[in-house]
UniProtKB/Swiss-Prot annotation:
Protein family (similarity comment): Belongs to the CAPAB/TerDEXZ family.
Functional description taken from the UniProt entry: Not known; could confer methyl methane sulfonate (MMS), mitomycin C (MC), and UV resistance.
Protein name per Swiss-Prot or TrEMBL: Chemical-damaging agent resistance protein C
Xref: InterPro entries: Stress/Tellurium_Resist, TerD
Source organism of this protein record: Clostridium acetobutylicum
Length: 192
């Protein structure tokens, strides 16, 4: 088992681990059982940002409709429509050695699909986590449990990978947003 982080903690990912080239960002959650008439569909989204914290264009947003960055460095491994089952619900593969120089950080977020229409929010989601796994060895390097701090939010910035010189660090963020995917897009410089 790797390092367990709390909200706001940062840790070196590649410093002292020069052989680490590919990691899997695993995101998981459970939906509290309630009869709202609709299934929950949570979606992982990665925003590949420049120094200003914004994406350059829509191609820097990796999600169920754009599964792979043009550089090949960031790849969403598929949309889980129900969140059922144990383990990671969605995964994003990161090739650290292929990330273009203009990308200084990658923010990992989770949104609830059609949250407003379905009257759903993160207060109805539990056991949320993000973890970083060495893609080659399958060793879990880092885990951050988000806890139960959310109520009316429909989107969360879970964590980020960011450049620190020639190294990569991981930051446990856990910041909630109202307004779902549209609010996140605006936050990262996209107009939808």
């Amino acid at each position: 088992m790797g390092i367990v982080l709390k909200k706001g903690q940062k840790v070196d990912l590649t410093k002292g681990n020069a052989s680490l080239k590919k990691v899997i960002i695993g995101l998981g959650w459970d939906v509290n059982k309630y009869d709202g008439g609709h299934d929950f569909d949570l979606d992982a989204v990665a925003f590949c940002c420049g120094e200003d914290g914004k994406v350059h264009n829509e191609a820097d947003m990796i999600f169920y409709n754009n599964l792979k960055h043009s550089s090949g460095a960031v790849e969403h491994l598929g949309d889980n429509l129900t969140g059922d089952g144990d383990g990671d619900d969605e995964q994003i593969l990161i090739d650290l050695s292929s990330i273009p120089q203009h990308i200084n950080k990658i923010d990992f977020t989770v949104t609830i699909h059609e949250a407003e229409e379905r009257k759903q929010n993160f207060g109805q989601v539990s056991n949320s986590y993000v973890r970083v796994v060495n893609s080659d060895t399958k060793e879990e390097l880092i885990k951050y449990d988000l806890g139960e701090d959310f109520s009316i939010e429909t989107a969360i910035v879970v964590a980020e990978l960011y450049r620190n010189g020639s190294e990569w660090k991981f930051n446990a963020i856990g910041s909630g947003f109202e307004g779902g995917l549209a609010a996140l897009c605006k936050n990262f410089g996209l107009n939808v």
